[in-house]
Swiss-Prot record:
Protein name according to UniProt: Zinc finger protein CKR1
InterPro entries: KRAB, KRAB_dom_sf, Znf_C2H2_sf, Znf_C2H2_type
Matching CDD domains: KRAB_A-box (cd07765)
KRAB domain ranges (all copies): 1-61
MF GO annotations: DNA-binding transcription factor activity, RNA polymerase II-specific; RNA polymerase II transcription regulatory region sequence-specific DNA binding; zinc ion binding
GO cellular component annotations of the record: nucleus
């Protein structure tokens, strides 16, 4: 049942049709064997009657009612069956099965309507017509709202529930409604407490072994999916598929992706849609192969914030964003009373009240619920802190962190709000402050003047390689690589200590 649950509604309906046809075929073959055996027994009985008629003295008199019944059976046997339609497979008529010992014959219809493509036969012409759509790819039932078409009316009825909000199947755990029972069953497995496949590194549980195998690559770093064009490797096949689209967009020729299908109807549908983009946006002219991507495109950024102009695809996202401007925090913590603007933040905060924190730091005693933040915290203790503050002796692993810390002692605040003039020591503080003013102002370049009067400017990085390779700093007379952010912080620090205040940059967020 597990592979059946993973199918989409259209594939499930096709699977049910094929299984029903197979069942009817087996029943028809079995009934044919029964009818053939009954016909042989009738032939033997007629011969015995003929032999008995030669000796009238010893044979008992016949019942007229039985004679009429037997005659009617013989007349029915001599009557030819109705002719099957032209071009349809003909099956020989089955011999009549008379009542024997009070047992009624089984009513199994003949299957005169055969498919010329695969040879399957059906008792009704309508069944054959519906089956033929598997080979032709015909989809006569179209949705009037989104234009998606289906081969059977039942599939269209199932699809239209998604538009009308008719979702009768509701999850008992979270209350989420679903249009079909199969979707509810697949969703309910996510709530199942039985997660037998557990990761040995972080303890996370999974319902399926394949999900655990995919998760294990996070710890092992395995990347089995390699791009044939540039050699870049990925841990998941879907990531490789998305990456290869970038080659097609940039003009580089990529090897064609071979797509496989489990049903011939899916292949027919794929061939009919390949290379065609009949759905076109009336506003920008962008074309799409199907209606659902066009609907998603129309929804993109349709809900805009009146304060900052930022667009959102959903009204709920806009409502959540509006709390940044209004300061609303409707989600309070029931234990400590702290309030949050988003429910996800409240759930994250609630974990701090739980005692289940198995990962404990041996240096500072801090506890963590999950392994990734614990490992990141441990790296902070293990890192070489060679950048030491001359005032308080505190060490830092990066020069940028030291430069930021130095502002605590110097009182330097290089980030100034262009609207009200308030200054801040960190750019993140300026970002939070500017939200209170409404729309964001454009970013201004980081610049100043050096000792010789030449302008200094933080040059933009052109690639990640330059970001990694072009970073140098002086550490104890030896050149060593540090983050580009450290270089920028050094420049910013020199400008703060050596240059007048009027030359300090006005930074935006």
């Amino acid at each position: 049942m597990e592979p059946y649950v993973l199918l989409d509604p259209r594939q499930k309906a096709l699977y049910r049709d094929v299984m029903q046809e197979s069942y009817e075929t087996l029943m028809s073959i079995a009934q044919g064997l029964v009818n053939h055996k009954a016909a042989e027994e009738d032939a033997v009985g007629l011969k015995e009657d003929a032999v008995g008629s030669e000796e009238p003295q010893t044979h008992p008199p016949h019942n007229p009612a039985q004679n009429r019944t037997a005659g009617s059976h013989r007349r029915k046997a001599k009557r030819p069956d109705k002719a099957a339609p032209l071009g349809v497979a003909q099956t020989p008529p089955a011999a009549p099965t008379p009542k024997r010992d009070g047992v009624k014959p089984s009513r199994v219809r003949d299957r005169p309507f055969g498919c010329p493509d695969c040879g399957k036969s059906f008792p009704w012409a309508s069944h054959l017509e519906r089956h033929r759509r598997v080979h032709t790819g015909e989809r006569p039932y179209s949705c009037p709202e989104c234009g998606e078409s289906y081969s059977q009316s039942s599939h269209l009825v199932q699809h239209r529930r998604t538009h009308g909000g008719d979702r009768p199947h509701k999850c008992q755990h979270c209350g989420k409604p679903f249009a079909g029972a199969a979707q509810l069953l697949a969703h309910s497995r996510g709530h199942a407490a039985d997660r037998p496949h557990r990761c040995g590194d972080c303890g996370k549980g999974f319902v399926w072994a394949s999900h655990l195998e995919r998760h294990r690559r996070v710890h092992t770093g395995e990347k089995p999916y390699e791009c044939p064009e540039c050699g870049e490797a990925f841990s998941q096949g879907s990531h490789l598929t998305k990456h290869r689209r970038s080659h097609a967009r940039s003009g580089r020729t990529a090897a064609p992706l071979r797509k496989c299908f489990g049903q011939s109807s899916d292949l027919v549908q794929h061939r009919s849609r390949a290379g065609k983009k009949p759905q076109r946006c009336a506003e920008c002219g962008k074309a799409f192969r199907a209606a659902p991507p066009l609907r998603r495109h129309r929804r993109e950024r349709s809900h805009r914030c009146g304060d900052c102009g930022k667009g959102f695809a959903w009204a709920s996202h806009l409502q959540r964003h509006r709390r940044v401007h209004t300061g609303e925090r409707p989600f309070p913590c029931g234990l400590c009373g702290e309030r949050f603007s988003q429910k996800a933040h409240l759930l994250q905060h609630g974990k701090t009240h739980r005692p289940e924190r198995p990962y404990k730091c041996g240096d500072c005693g801090k506890r963590f619920e999950n392994a990734p933040p614990f490992l990141a915290h441990r790296r902070g203790h293990a890192a070489l802190k060679s950048f030491t503050c001359g005032d308080c002796g505190k060490g830092f692993a990066w020069a940028s962190h030291l430069q930021r810390h130095r502002r605590v002692h110097t009182g330097e605040k290089p980030y100034e709000c262009p609207e009200c003039g308030e200054a801040f020591s960190q750019g993140s503080h300026l970002t939070k402050h500017r939200r209170s003013h409404g729309p964001k102002a454009p970013l201004l370049p980081v610049q100043g003047r050096g000792e010789a009067g030449e302008p200094l400017r933080a040059s933009p990085l052109s690639s990640g390689a330059e970001q990694r390779d072009g970073r140098r700093a002086q550490r104890g007379g030896v050149e060593e690589e540090v983050g580009w952010g450290a270089n920028r912080a050094v420049l910013r620090g020199r400008s703060a200590h050596s240059w007048p205040r009027s030359h300090l940059p006005m930074l935006g967020c």
